[in-house]
Amino acid sequence: MKLSFTKMHGAGNDFVVLDGYTRALPPLTGAQVRALADRHFGIGADQLLLVEKPTVDGADFKYRIFNCDGGEVEHCGNGARCFVKFVRDHGLTGKASVRVEVKHGVITLTMQDNGEVVVDMGAPVFEPARVPFDASGLDGRREGADTLWPLPVNGVTRWISVVSMGNPHAVQIVDDAEAFAVRVDGPAIERDPRFPQRVNAGFMQIVSRHEVNLRVYERGAGETLACGTGACAAVAAGIRRGRLDSPVTVHTHGGTLTISWNGACDERAPLMMAGPATTVFEGVIELPA
């Protein structure tokens, strides 16, 4: 079967986007997702994004996202930005703002006149059981309004914030994000048994109260050039710890995101993420068996 696709990226976090809205797509197996995402024998991507018809009232579209290991995940902020550019560029909507069904609810995406996309990422969740994170038997340490949890990582105790942005994140503050051994500690944190759904590991260097450098080791994808939900989780943790003030410029290897959150006044407030979305190329590929 021939499969039309669009290759896109948001700040270097790249996606294969498939249109299941105007045409019927067969259910994709994990092996097929891995083959399409393979950078040597397939198209190459961190994740695969499906555009579908919504199944809930009040949504214009539905999106599903799969990591390059074939597993379906809850949410991706960079993918959400690419999503709204895709549906507008392909004439599926003329709206500047669209409401999109994701696994954990409905989010609002807005295309700005400058070409950047603003995503209402929803409110962060800090309760360990809802992240989910098993904090049983651990003695947490308070910093500001946050609780830091000790996690043994390769023989060293790391103090982490746990945050859900619809998907789980473990955030730690480091002195130098560029020099930190992300690809050593990242896999150990990702698969720590206290995270029953595995976890995205964020390593944040604070430059000022409005600026950070961030690297994220994503579950099922490894280190990516940018992670939208990871940027939101890191900023939320930093504000809650009293280290950051909104808005925050987040520098990643792939580009810059701007995160705003009024969480110092109301933790139920949504995080707003602004950043680029870029189409790289379009093509047709034979769907692997």
Swiss-Prot record:
SUPFAM superfamilies: Diaminopimelate epimerase-like. GO terms for cellular component: cytosol. GO terms for molecular function: diaminopimelate epimerase activity. InterPro entries: DAP_epimerase_AS, DAP_epimerase_DapF. The active site is at C76, C227. One of its GO terms (biological process) is lysine biosynthetic process via diaminopimelate. It catalyses: (2S,6S)-2,6-diaminopimelate = meso-2,6-diaminopimelate. It is found in: Cytoplasm. The record marks H169, E218 as: Could be important to modulate the pK values of the two catalytic cysteine residues. It is an enzyme of class 5 (isomerase). Pathway: Amino-acid biosynthesis; L-lysine biosynthesis via DAP pathway; DL-2,6-diaminopimelate from LL-2,6-diaminopimelate: step 1/1. Substrate binds at N13, Q47, N67, G77, N78, N167, N200, E218, R219, G228, T229. Its EC number is 5.1.1.7. Homodimer. PANTHER family: DIAMINOPIMELATE EPIMERASE, DIAMINOPIMELATE EPIMERASE, CHLOROPLASTIC. Belongs to the diaminopimelate epimerase family. HAMAP family: DAP_epimerase. Catalyzes the stereoinversion of LL-2,6-diaminopimelate (L,L-DAP) to meso-diaminopimelate (meso-DAP), a precursor of L-lysine and an essential component of the bacterial peptidoglycan. This is Diaminopimelate epimerase.
